[in-house]
């Protein structure tokens, strides 16, 4: 779980700094509205790991921390951009959760929540541009590079 969290945090930070991303939903980022709740809900062993991680991997102004392997984000644009991003990924596989340690990506509006009427999905914040990532335990740099190249492929023309 540590590797999932560390990788997910790196992916979330990469997405957050991208001009092609509208917003990132990851409780370990200070920008998340429930980041304090997420931190205080950690069990003692996870809290110990997070505090050690922050001590050795974060600057004083960076209050982020590894929190699960799930990252959601809204790509700028709509379904066309979201689908292009997903098909441009090389490491992340397009699939719903398979219970493994490999990185997966999905478009909830078309996959897990496809049976919900569009108007209801919008009320729930599940638009056509929402992408959900299950970040695996591959090399962090490889995952970050995959995100960056897929974003470039999507928006480069």
Q: Residue ranges of each PLM-predicted region?
A:
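Flexible, glycine/proline-enriched loop segments at strand-loop-helix junctions
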Residues: 1
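PLP-dependent enzyme catalytic core of the Aspartate aminotransferase-like
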Residues: 87-88, 97, 103-157
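Conserved small-domain helix->loop->beta segment predominantly found in fold-type I
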Residues: 9-90, 94-103, 116-122
């Amino acid at each position: 779980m540590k590797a999932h969290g560390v990788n997910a945090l790196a992916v979330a930070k990469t997405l957050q700094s991208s001009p092609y991303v509208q917003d990132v939903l990851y409780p370990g980022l200070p920008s998340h509205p429930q980041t304090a709740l997420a931190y205080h809900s950690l069990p003692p062993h996870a809290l110990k790991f997070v505090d050690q991680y922050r001590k050795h991997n974060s600057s004083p102004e960076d209050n982020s921390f590894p929190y699960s392997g799930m990252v959601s984000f809204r790509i700028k644009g709509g379904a066309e951009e979201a689908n292009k991003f997903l098909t441009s990924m090389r490491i992340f596989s397009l699939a719903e959760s398979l219970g493994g340690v490999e990185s997966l990506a999905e478009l909830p509006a078309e996959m897990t929540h496809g049976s919900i009427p569009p108007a209801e999905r919008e009320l729930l914040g599940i638009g056509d541009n929402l992408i959900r990532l299950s970040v695996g335990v591959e090399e962090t740099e490889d995952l970050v590079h995959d995100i960056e190249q897929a974003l470039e492929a999507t928006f480069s023309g």
